[in-house]
Amino acid sequence: MYKDRDTNQRDSRFENQQDGFKKNSNFRFFKRKSCKFCDSGKHPDYKDFDFLKKFITEQGKILPKRITGTSAKHQRRLALEIKRARYMALLPFVKK
């Protein structure tokens, strides 16, 4: 069945590949975002609503940590403080 194929032709397809993996030129290395709270020593506070606005979308949703770059500990605290600020009417629940 495979006797008709030329082995040199089959091997020439893999000449430009290393270890059978094709190099992906579209892959980019991204610098890991650092937590603003860990770097500065500052903690999220519901009274600082101008600073909390940076972590909210235009619709009023809380941005995820993969976008903001905050650590898991500070992301949980940030969400809690945003919810407190909403309850105290310092931040809107929904923006229109």
From Swiss-Prot:
This is Small ribosomal subunit protein bS18. GO terms for cellular component: cytosolic small ribosomal subunit. InterPro entries: Ribosomal_bS18, Ribosomal_bS18_CS, Ribosomal_bS18_sf. GO terms for biological process: translation. It comes from the Bacteria. GO terms for molecular function: small ribosomal subunit rRNA binding; structural constituent of ribosome. Belongs to the bacterial ribosomal protein bS18 family.
